Amino acid sequence: MSGNTLGTLFTVTTFGESHGPAIGCVIDGCPPGMGLTEADIQVELDRRKPGTSRHVTQRQEADEVEILSGVFEGVTTGTPIALLIRNTDQRSKDYGNIVETFRPGHADYTYWQKYGIRDYRGGGRSSARLTAPIVGAGAVAKKWLRERFGVEVRGYMSGLGEIDVPFVDWSHVHENPFFSPNAAVVPELEAYMDALRKEGDSIGARIDVVASGVPVGWGEPVFDRLDADIAKAMMSINAVKGVEIGAGFDSVAQRGSVHGDELTPAGFVGNHAGGVLGGISTGQDITVSIAIKPTSSIRTPRRSITKSGEEATVETFGRHDPCVGIRATPIAESMLALVLIDHALRHRAQCGDVETPTPKIAGSAT
């Protein structure tokens, strides 16, 4: 398995399995001299960890992070930063009934056909449990971006199943388990999830992420365009089946006179491009949306096959999120931050001294 590393200058390599002794990552390329403690990382991990409400998996993992290297006396040294998170609440017996069968919608079948072996316990390497070290690495990236450039990366749930969640205020996001920016919708979301859980079914979600304060110039055309790398990173998150940047698929119905964001001395008029033009950041907010599919592990009986190709019926009884999107907001934020820090360092390496006579305009003219 060779696809375990994200990034070019700021790289993150994850390791571990869902029911192994531990999971973690190695961060390479982090600039030296930044203050960093385990508490800086833990605050982000606590936003993602399981067992925080009745609407998510009841697997009780503290997700306590250990910094093993790369930090001396509370400051990054520029050497690889190793983060370790120990698994403490594995319950592998829940997966005994899928040793010889494949769960529909999961990576069981594809991992088996590709590698000829698979860790059936909680999905092994394909489990969303492996997003915890991504959030840990994202905490490091967020801190550097915020301190060096004033960049803020924030996200929220904008849709759960058939329920739209209109944005009201960022302050609402941290006050409920759904990361909803609209407190008035939370009771409806709770009732929806309670009914779904009783049915033994699952549902998808939409998550929106915004990076503000990103300067103009980040991105490496043509094959490492900023939006291309963002899309790749987001699609690397478990269960993500779609990515939009800016107006996204709504661009199809927009005319050029509407979609093209005009430039004025006072700033841009509109942001249909989502903060990226030609693969390079414009200085506007970078806006990203992801579509997350329904959880594949459900109690509803589903048709499948055994390893020998015979018909089988699969019911999954483990502790699973009825909607993985509920805990996806900090994961999506982290992925965006990891792409941004990598491109910030790449831009500094080649074009850090470039100056033009044209003034940098504001992200919004209003």
UniProtKB/Swiss-Prot annotation:
Gene3D superfamilies for the chain: Chorismate synthase AroC
Annotated InterPro entries: Chorismate_synth, Chorismate_synth_AroC_sf, Chorismate_synthase_CS
Gene Ontology molecular function terms on file: chorismate synthase activity; FMN binding
Biological or metabolic pathway of the protein: Metabolic intermediate biosynthesis; chorismate biosynthesis; chorismate from D-erythrose 4-phosphate and phosphoenolpyruvate: step 7/7
Recorded catalytic activity of this chain's protein: 5-O-(1-carboxyvinyl)-3-phosphoshikimate = chorismate + phosphate
A Pfam entry, by short name: Chorismate_synt
Keywords assigned: Amino-acid biosynthesis, Aromatic amino acid biosynthesis, FAD, Flavoprotein, FMN, Lyase, NADP
Sequence positions that bind FMN: R125, S126, S127, N238, A239, G278, K293, P294, T295, S296, S297, R319
Signal sequence, start to end: none
GO terms for biological process, alphabetical: amino acid biosynthetic process; aromatic amino acid family biosynthetic process; chorismate biosynthetic process
Binding site for NADP(+): R48, R54
Chain ranges passing through the membrane: none
GO CC, alphabetical: cytosol
Cofactor mode of binding and number, as noted: Reduced FMN (FMNH(2)).
SUPFAM superfamilies reported for this sequence: Chorismate synthase, AroC (SSF103263)
EC numbers for this chain: 4.2.3.5
Disulfide bonds: none
Family in the record: Belongs to the chorismate synthase family.
Function: This reaction introduces a second double bond into the aromatic ring system.
Subunit structure as annotated in this protein's UniProt entry: Homotetramer.
Protein name: Chorismate synthase
Species of provenance: Burkholderia cenocepacia (strain ATCC BAA-245 / DSM 16553 / LMG 16656 / NCTC 13227 / J2315 / CF5610) (Burkholderia cepacia (strain J2315))
Encoding gene, per UniProt annotation: aroC
